[in-house]
A protein has these predicted regions:
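A short glycine/threonine-centered beta-strand motif
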Residues: 1-3
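Autoinhibitory propeptides
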Residues: 6-73
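Hydrophobic residues at beta-strand termini and immediately following loops
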Residues: 31, 50, 107-110, 154-156
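Short, acidic/turn-prone active-site loops that include or flank metal/cofactor-
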Residues: 54-56, 108-114
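Short acidic, Gly/Pro-enriched loop/turn segments at secondary-structure junctions
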Residues: 57-62, 159-169
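Subtilisin-like serine protease catalytic core
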Residues: 73-106, 114-166, 180-184
Length: 184
C-alpha cells in the first residue's frame, strides 16, 4: 500500500496512541495503544497483523572464551576503511578502541538516550574488542580480528542484556541507511 505508515500513523494518533518509531523498510510501526484501539486498527486492510513487542536477550560470553580467538595478521588485513555495525549493550570507550585515534564513530543509545558511548552490561564492549580491539592495553598480545575498522554502535540492549525486537529492527534499518556513507 502506498503511504502505509502515514495513513496508519494518522489512525494511531486519532485513537490517542503514541508512535514510538517507524521502520519503513519493513512497513512496521511501533506504537503504544489501548486494547480497543488495537482491535479497531485490525479492521483496516493495510494492517496485516499486530503483535506485542518482544524482548530478545544477549547471549553470554566470557573473557576466557573471547581470549581463545587467535588472530594472524600475516596477510596484513586490518579492516582499514571498513565500518562495522554493532547492535548490542553499548560500547565503553576502552583504550583498545580509542587509541591512538577513536574508532567509535557512531553511538546511538535507544535505552537511556545518553549522548556519549557507554556499556552498562559489558557484552557490547567485549564484542567490539573481539572485532576491533588494537591491543594497545596489552602490548599487542590481545588484538581483534580487524583492529582498524570503525565502530557504529546502537545500544538496543539494557544493563540486564534484554532489548526490544522493535529497537533491534530499527537499529538494523539505520545501519543499512548508513552503510554507503561509512562502508558498513
Amino acid at each position: 500500500y502506498r503511504n502505509f505508515p502515514d495513513s496508519i500513523s494518522k489512525k494511531i494518533h486519532s485513537y490517542r496512541g503514541n508512535i514510538i518509531r517507524k521502520i519503513e523498510s519493513c512497513n512496521i510501526i511501533c506504537a503504544q495503544l489501548r486494547a480497543k484501539s488495537i482491535h479497531l486498527l485490525l479492521e483496516y486492510p493495510e494492517v496485516k497483523y499486530i503483535c506485542l513487542d518482544q524482548y530478545f536477550f544477549l547471549c553470554g560470553m566470557s573473557i576466557p572464551t573471547a581470549n581463545k580467538v587467535r588472530i594472524s595478521h600475516k596477510l596484513s588485513l586490518y579492516g582499514r576503511g571498513i565500518g562495522v555495525g554493532i547492535i548490542d549493550s553499548g560500547v565503553y570507550p576502552h583504550r583498545d578502541l580509542t587509541y591512538p585515534f577513536n574508532r567509535i564513530i557512531t553511538f546511538v543509545d535507544l535505552i537511556n538516550e545518553l549522548p556519549y558511548p557507554y556499556d552498562d552490561n559489558g557484552h557490547g564492549t567485549c564484542t567490539c574488542g573481539i572485532i576491533s580491539g588494537n591491543g594497545s592495553s596489552s602490548n599487542k598480545i590481545y588484538t581483534g580480528v580487524a583492529p582498524e575498522v570503525t565502530i557504529h554502535c546502537f545500544k538496543a540492549f539494557d544493563k540486564l542484556g534484554k532489548g526490544y525486537v522493535s529497537d533491534i529492527l530499527f537499529s538494523l534499518e539505520e545501519l543499512i541507511t548508513m552503510s554507503d556513507k561509512y562502508n558498513i
